Amino acid sequence: MSLALQTQGFSKNQCVTGLRAAVGILEKWQANSDQACRLLRISRSTYTRARQRDPAWAVALDADQMQRISFVLNIHATLRLIFDNPQNVYGFVSMANDNEFFNGRSPLEIMAQGDMISLYETFRRIDALRGGQW
């Protein structure tokens, strides 16, 4: 993690906006609440509040949590570049994958282990699918 990300403060509005976007994506990926909480490193109550979309609700998240949100958003953006079909955009993450890294597990299963390395490595492999698109 870069020093700039570690020291950058995020407003509660930025935190809520990012968290709600990530939770919405995770729901479309068919992540259950336990998987989402482990992946984002948030409590069950924070997850529930994010889903309720109460406009008065605010939350402060740390740099690690914001980086996790960033990975979810970037994985989603990459999948939208790779696939035209919404079923693939939202279904890919929950499908079993026989790639050596995934070893028959879904990307969601790997990410839901909860450690940053699993999240990063999953992002890296999905991002590599873009190949020469850039």
Regions found by a protein language model. Give the residues of each.
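Non-transmembrane "mature" sequence context
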Residues: 1-134
